[in-house]
Amino acid sequence: MTANFSTHVFSPQHCGCDRLTSIDDVRQCLTEYIYWSSYAYRNRQCAGQLYSTLLSFRDDAESVFIDVRELVKNMPWDDVKDCVEIIRCYIPDEQKTIREISAIIGLCAYAATYWGGEDHPTSNSLNALFVMLKMLNYVDYNIIFRRMN
């Protein structure tokens, strides 16, 4: 009997970075980060300083959404529109605070990790990415750029 081990480690462009050099990189970096969060820990590259900062956004998710684990478990991640509406119950304003922006990223990263696959994302973890992209706009990316650096 032989063991079958996967040697693939997901390693996105910004994972090992310490900071971003341009506001134009924020959306791509966040997309990679949520995608990276969808992989099992052993199948993704270790986080650099930039991703460590993004991981800290889960604390903001706890402060805004209170019980993040229960919320993530109970949200209908198979329906992006419904998830966006649920988040808007907590964060109704179009103009969000830095904590609210961070909380959205943290919630979606938590969902991507919770619903993620062993060696590839699942449809629910990818929907967490789509929810984040629906919730954030260029102004939000500009605000969060300062916190990421």
Curated annotation (Swiss-Prot):
Any Gene Ontology biological process: symbiont-mediated suppression of host NF-kappaB cascade
A Pfam match: Poxv_Bcl-2-like
Metal-binding in keyword set: no
Top-rank lineage group of the source organism: Viruses
Record-linked InterPro entries: Poxvirus_B14/B22/C16, Poxvirus_Bcl-2-like, Poxvirus_sf
Coiled-coil residue windows: none
Keywords: Early protein, Host-virus interaction, Inhibition of host NF-kappa-B by virus
Family to which this protein belongs: Belongs to the orthopoxvirus OPG200 family.
Summary of subunit composition and partner proteins: Homodimers. Interacts with host IKBKB; this interaction inhibits host NF-kappa-B activation.
Annotated function: Contributes to virulence by binding to the host IKBKB subunit of the IKK complex and preventing host NF-kappa-B activation in response to pro-inflammatory stimuli such as TNF-alpha or IL1B. Mechanistically, sterically hinders the direct contact between the kinase domains of IKBKB in the IKK complex containing IKBKB, CHUK/IKKA and NEMO.
Protein name: Protein OPG200
Native organism: Variola virus (isolate Human/India/Ind3/1967)
